[in-house]
Structures are given as structure tokens and as C-alpha cells.
């Protein structure tokens, strides 16, 4: 069998194989110039001389295939010493092992206009493409790249089963009206990337239905939806670029964003945020998307209730994704900085800010929202910003952001304080304090429902110790304290959104976005103009 003919066949079929090429030999060796093909099952075509050195090269080739990386092997025909292979020839050889037939596989569920455009572009990027649909006419081979695998099935569920989807595959669902059928089959499968081409409203509906079905949050968090980069894409070809950009980012483990140096002065500088609750997370997202690196500091057991939109959840789960941005728990400054380079938001347990000297941030944002200052000082960083009451701009910090709802929400205050907290939650359909749930006594939190569940007034949603906690009104559970946390009487443990199934519990609130905008405005102005310290007053230079 010709080694290159076999290599061409395996490459066409996208079957993994390694090519071992002798690149150097000295002294007595079985061969001085030869190639050998090693298949994924260990079988070979050709030979580099047989014996112990060939066995060793086969082992190295299989390891290279497993790691999907080429390598250089050095072997000495000796029984002892470095690089010895266990033979007596006395020579030495070096073998370069390259890996092939490992094109990433992209599976497209649905053969509509967008997936056709994605297939055409993905072929140019070297993907091995498979497309499935229930309409035979949509699978016209002329609409797809020549090497595309086309599958017709009676249902999308049957198509998913027939496609033999593997953990290293990238899968995009884009059907006319049967996305949910495919999603149900795929949501719990280990996949490198799972995307859904759908509107934000449809995504919210599907996420709620998946949770009602009992799908674990760790599986739901893997779904990329709505999918793609926000580049204003409208045509199938533009959408294809948007989607493939996200797939390539995941495939290449890259942070994303523009390659050019930002025209604004952020320069990817570091901002440390104290607190990682839902408001703090809205601030983090605003800064992250503006080009800043963000690290968040939390307490050991965060008491957030809007857990689906709070990066603090990473303290419990190790990882948390909000609106497509992922936070990961970090245990050291070095680990945190590496995570920022990879496009993540690190969350660290450091309520006392003891790591600031190591992190050396450009800015510190106090987003604890404790209604009092828990140790934030203006000299913690070149720029220090605080949210809400409890701070005095020009004394504790360089700027304070208004957090009360109304005309001044998000206002930047450079001298003085924010308004006092009203103590009245935001009005939703006429409900304010009634929709907020508080512990009737001290005890341990145990939930009976999940975030996103629809409940009726009087339903038992949790227990504090032996005390039943009942829903104060009919609606959606939008906030709920993590199980196992100890609380005191009167502590806020949850909230109900009276809008019911139309409520959105997976997106950052309008309040958080407004406050985040205020933080960004303050940071940009203070960076532009600089901050000059005097003995008693800090003023913008």
C-alpha cells in the first residue's frame, strides 16, 4: 500500500493519523531516511526500520494524536541512558511526528439559508461539515461545499442520534420551528460548543422550559444563545461571519475583541470590583465590553439572590456565565491575571482587598452596596469609585454613582454623597415591598423551587429552618438565596416578579446597566483628566 495514497484517503475522510519522518540519524540505525503512517488504532503503513525504535515511535505517534499536537522524538539504539529505546545498534535518530486528519467537525442542525452560508464559510476555515434536515429538498448538494456530509431524517431528534456527535464537535441548531426538539437531545451531551440561532425572547422561553424539565444549570450554562458577535449582521452571509467568529474564539481558546489598540484610553487596564452581586456584575459587563480587564472580589459565602445574573455564583459553582461572558473562581493573583488574558472575569474570595498590592489595578470600584463604607479608601488605586450611599466623593473616593431609581439613577457625583436609600424596592406592576421575600427567623436556607420557576401566591418556595416560606404573590421566581446559607431574621432571601413568564431572569437589569454606564463615564473622565490628591480633598485636575 502506498503511504501517500493512504494519507490522502484518510485526510479526505478526516480520519486521524500521524506521519513519522526520520529527520536525522547518526551511526548504526535501521533506516536513515524513511516515513511511516500511524493510524489512530496503532496500525501502520510503511516502516522506519522496525524493532524497538519503531514501537517507541508508534507509541509517541498515538500520544501526539491524543494531544492533537506534533512532536519531535529522539531515540538512541541503546539499553541505558537518556532516550534509550532498548536495542543494541549503537546509533541514534530523530523523528518528526505530525498529526493529520483532525479537522474540527461542525454539525449544522437545519439546512436553511443561514446554515448554508455557514457551511460555505466554514469549509474555507478547514471544518469537517455535517448538515441534517427533515426536508430532503433543503439538502441539495449544490447548496453546500463538495465534502459536506448531508443527512436526511424523519425528525431532528432522529437526526441528532444518527450524526454520532462527539465531545470535540461544534454544533449549531438553526431550524425553522423545531429547535426545541434538537435542543432537548443535545443540551446534556458533552460538546465542545453548542449554539442556538434564535431571538432573545425564544432563548428565554427555552431556558425556562429546560429548567422546568429539570435540566441542570451546568448543562444550561453551556448553551451559547443568542449566538454570534454583535456586528449588525442581517444577511445569511453576515450572520455566518458573526457565528463563525464565536466558534473560532472557543476553538482557539482566544479572548476575542479587536486586534487593534483601542482608540479609547482603557488600554485593557485592570479594574478591581468589590462585590460580585447582580449590580456589580452589570458594572463588570459594562467595563469588560469597553475593553477593561476586570477582577471581582467577594466574601466566602456571597448572599446574592439574583444568582443567574451575578458573577458571585462562581464562588459556589467554580464558573458563572452572564450574557455570554464567563467568570471563573481564582485562588491566586497569578491565576487571576492569566484568566483575564484568556478573556475571563476572575472572581476571588478577598473581602479585605488584601491582594490589591499584587494586582495593582488602575481602578477600584466598591459595588458591595452595603449602604456603608466597608473599608474602601481613595488611595486604593489611581481611580476609586463607589456605588450608592455611605461614601463621600472627594473624601472616601473620587466619584460616587447614584443608585436610587429615578431621574438621577447612574449620575456621577464628584463631590458629595448619593441619595439615602429609600428602602422601597422597584415598582413592578404595582408591587414593591410585597414581592420581596425575607426570612421570618434565623436559620438555614433550603429552597423548594428554582430561579425561573412560575409560582402561585401561597406556594411553598423555601424553608428557613422549620419555617415555611410562601410566595407572597403569583409570578416568576427571579431571586433566591443559595441553599445552605445561614441567615438572620429579616434577611432578604428572594423575590417574585409579578410579570410571570414574560419576566427575564437571565439578563442584567436596566438598573445595573444604568449604574454600569455611570461607572464607565466616571472612569473614562478621571482617566482623561487625572486625579490630583491634596491633604483633605481629592479634586479633578
Swiss-Prot record:
InterPro entries: MoCofactor_Util/Proc, Se-dep_Mo_hydrolase_YqeB, XdhC_CoxI, XdhC_Rossmann_dom
Organism expressing this protein natively: Escherichia coli (strain K12)
Protein name per Swiss-Prot or TrEMBL: Uncharacterized protein YqeB
Matching Gene3D superfamilies: NAD(P)-binding Rossmann-like Domain, Zn peptidases
PANTHER family tied to this protein: ALDEHYDE OXIDOREDUCTASE MOLYBDENUM COFACTOR ASSEMBLY PROTEIN, XANTHINE DEHYDROGENASE SUBUNIT A-RELATED
Gene, per the UniProt record: yqeB
Pfam families linked to this entry: XdhC_C, XdhC_CoxI
SUPFAM superfamilies the UniProt entry points to: Zn-dependent exopeptidases
Stretches of the chain forming a coiled coil according to its record: none
Amino acid at each position: 500500500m502506498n503511504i501517500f495514497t493512504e494519507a490522502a484517503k484518510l485526510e479526505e475522510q478526516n480520519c486521524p493519523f500521524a506521519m513519522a519522518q526520520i529527520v536525522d540519524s547518526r551511526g548504526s540505525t535501521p533506516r536513515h531516511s524513511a516515513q511511516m503512517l500511524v493510524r489512530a488504532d496503532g496500525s501502520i503503513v510503511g516502516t522506519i526500520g522496525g524493532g524497538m525504535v519503531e514501537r517507541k515511535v508508534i507509541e509517541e505517534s498515538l500520544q501526539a494524536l491524543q494531544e492533537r499536537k506534533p512532536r519531535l522524538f529522539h531515540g538512541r539504539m541503546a539499553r541505558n541512558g537518556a532516550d534509550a529505546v532498548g536495542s543494541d545498534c549503537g546509533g541514534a535518530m530523530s523523528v518528526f511526528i505530525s498529526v493529520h486528519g483532525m479537522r474540527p467537525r461542525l454539525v449544522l442542525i437545519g439546512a436553511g439559508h443561514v446554515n448554508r452560508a455557514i457551511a460555505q464559510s466554514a469549509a474555507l476555515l478547514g471544518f469537517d461539515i455535517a448538515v441534517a434536515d427533515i426536508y430532503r429538498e433543503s439538502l441539495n448538494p449544490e447548496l453546500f461545499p463538495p465534502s459536506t456530509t448531508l443527512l436526511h431524517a424523519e425528525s431532528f431528534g432522529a437526526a441528532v442520534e444518527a450524526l454520532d456527535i462527539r465531545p470535540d464537535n461544534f454544533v449549531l441548531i438553526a431550524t425553522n420551528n423545531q429547535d426545541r426538539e434538537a435542543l432537548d437531545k443535545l443540551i446534556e451531551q458533552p460538546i465542545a460548543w453548542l449554539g442556538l440561532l434564535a431571538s432573545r425572547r425564544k432563548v428565554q422561553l427555552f431556558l425556562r422550559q429546560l429548567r422546568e424539565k429539570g435540566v441542570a444549570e451546568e448543562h444550561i450554562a453551556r448553551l451559547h444563545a443568542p449566538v454570534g458577535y454583535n456586528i449588525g449582521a442581517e444577511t445569511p452571509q453576515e450572520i455566518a461571519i458573526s457565528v463563525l467568529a464565536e466558534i473560532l474564539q472557543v476553538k482557539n481558546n482566544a479572548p476575542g475583541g479587536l486586534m487593534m489598540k483601542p482608540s479609547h484610553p482603557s488600554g485593557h487596564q485592570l479594574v478591581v470590583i468589590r462585590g460580585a452581586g447582580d449590580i456589580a456584575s452589570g458594572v463588570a459587563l459594562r467595563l469588560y465590553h469597553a475593553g477593561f480587564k476586570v477582577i471581582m472580589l467577594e466574601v466566602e459565602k456571597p448572599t446574592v439572590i439574583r444568582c443567574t445574573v451575578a458573577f458571585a455564583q462562581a464562588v459556589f459553582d467554580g464558573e458563572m456565565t452572564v450574557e455570554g461572558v464567563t467568570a471563573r473562581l481564582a485562588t491566586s493573583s497569578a491565576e487571576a491575571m492569566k484568566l483575564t488574558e484568556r478573556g475571563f472575569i476572575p472572581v476571588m474570595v478577598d473581602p479585605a482587598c488584601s491582594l490589591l498590592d499584587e494586582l495593582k489595578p488602575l481602578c477600584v470600584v466598591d459595588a458591595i452596596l452595603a449602604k456603608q463604607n466597608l473599608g474602601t479608601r481613595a488611595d486604593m488605586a489611581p481611580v476609586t469609585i463607589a456605588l450608592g450611599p455611605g461614601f463621600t466623593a472627594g473624601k472616601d473616593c473620587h466619584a460616587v454613582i447614584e443608585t436610587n431609581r429615578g431621574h438621577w439613577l447612574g449620575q456621577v457625583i464628584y463631590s458629595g454623597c448619593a441619595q439615602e436609600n429609600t428602602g422601597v424596592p422597584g415598582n413592578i406592576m404595582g408591587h414593591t415591598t410585597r414581592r420581596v421575600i425575607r426570612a421570618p427567623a434565623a436559620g438555614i436556607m433550603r429552597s423548594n423551587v428554582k430561579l425561573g420557576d412560575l409560582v402561585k401566591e401561597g406556594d411553598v418556595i423555601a424553608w428557613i429552618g422549620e419555617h415555611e416560606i410562601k410566595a407572597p404573590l403569583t409570578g416568576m421566581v427571579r431571586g433566591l438565596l443559595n441553599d445552605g446559607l445561614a441567615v438572620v431574621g429579616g434577611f432578604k432571601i428572594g423575590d417574585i416578579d409579578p410579570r410571570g413568564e414574560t419576566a427575564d431572569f437571565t439578563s442584567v437589569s436596566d438598573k445595573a446597566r444604568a449604574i454600569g454606564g455611570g461607572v464607565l463615564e466616571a472612569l473614562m473622565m478621571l482617566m482623561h483628566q487625572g486625579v490630583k490628591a491634596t491633604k483633605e480633598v481629592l479634586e479633578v485636575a
